[in-house]
């Protein structure tokens, strides 16, 4: 009889990182939160869609807040105490995500940067909606 292949889950190695960088990507459809160390190696991540928000609920400020809280709770397990914030995009969850990082206990915000790419008359924007 053939052996069954049993999938084994990789063990998450707990790192001891004091400082991290929180990348907030706030699009019109979703909010992605990625936490890295200072070198850019990913520690943990979370998205509004990954937390169970589907459809238009993913783009709400509440979903962005929940995504930040989820990512920071994972990052605290790795010892993150001080963070810098890099924000990209102009979605509705942008401001709420920044505020909820600052409101989280045990995490000190050192700096905030906006890394949204600005085009100098680049691609043609999508046509206007007709409702």
From Swiss-Prot:
One of its GO terms (cellular component) is ribonucleoprotein complex. GO terms for molecular function: rRNA binding; structural constituent of ribosome. Transmembrane segments: none annotated. Signal peptide: none annotated. Keywords: Ribonucleoprotein, Ribosomal protein, RNA-binding, rRNA-binding. Pfam families: Ribosomal_S11. The keyword RNA-binding applies. One of its GO terms (biological process) is translation. Gene3D superfamilies: Ribosomal protein S11. Belongs to the universal ribosomal protein uS11 family. Located on the platform of the 30S subunit, it bridges several disparate RNA helices of the 16S rRNA. Forms part of the Shine-Dalgarno cleft in the 70S ribosome. NCBIfam families: PRK05309.1, uS11_bact. Part of the 30S ribosomal subunit. Interacts with proteins S7 and S18. Binds to IF-3. HAMAP family: Ribosomal_uS11. This is Small ribosomal subunit protein uS11. It comes from Helicobacter acinonychis (strain Sheeba). The lineage of its organism: Bacteria, Pseudomonadati, Campylobacterota, Epsilonproteobacteria, Campylobacterales. The gene is rpsK.
